[in-house]
Design a protein with these regions (language model features):
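The feature marks the mature, well-folded catalytic cores of soluble enzymes
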Residues: 1-126
Length: 126
């Protein structure tokens, strides 16, 4: 299974492509119990946590924008904005995802903020 941002050349070798918003749904529909998830291990781990019945293998890669965000960055942001919601993309490191108020794709973030009533008490979003 290859992430949509994978090179065209690599996609030709894969059985399925996904996006961050469709990864869980697509993986849940695969008959295979073993999935090679490329190239982003952070997104792959996020998907795997939601499907313990499947076995995942990951490629050592990552989105250059998301892998630079650290737990220390989260700590600084929370200190500067203590009442803000922290939204993160599933391609962020696990240490960041674990501290988030919401994890989702860039498409899903604005859509789900109101749907899940996340803004009821806090008005600021990081």
């Amino acid at each position: 299974l290859a992430y949509i941002n994978t090179t065209s050349e690599l996609k030709t070798e894969c059985d399925v492509c996904d996006t961050s918003s469709s990864a869980v749904q697509i993986c849940s529909r695969l008959d295979n119990d073993k999935i090679l998830f490329i190239p982003d291990p952070n997104l792959g781990r996020y998907v795997a946590e939601q499907m313990p019945e499947k076995t995942f293998a990951f490629y050592k890669g990552g989105c250059p924008r998301h892998i630079v965000v650290s737990a220390k960055d989260v700590e600084k942001a929370r200190k500067a904005h203590p009442n803000a919601l922290l939204l993160v993309h599933p391609e962020c490191r696990q240490e960041v995802v674990e501290q988030a108020d919401y994890v989702g794709s860039t498409t899903g973030m604005p859509r789900n903020l109101t749907a899940e009533n996340l803004l009821s008490e806090r008005k600021t979003v990081l």
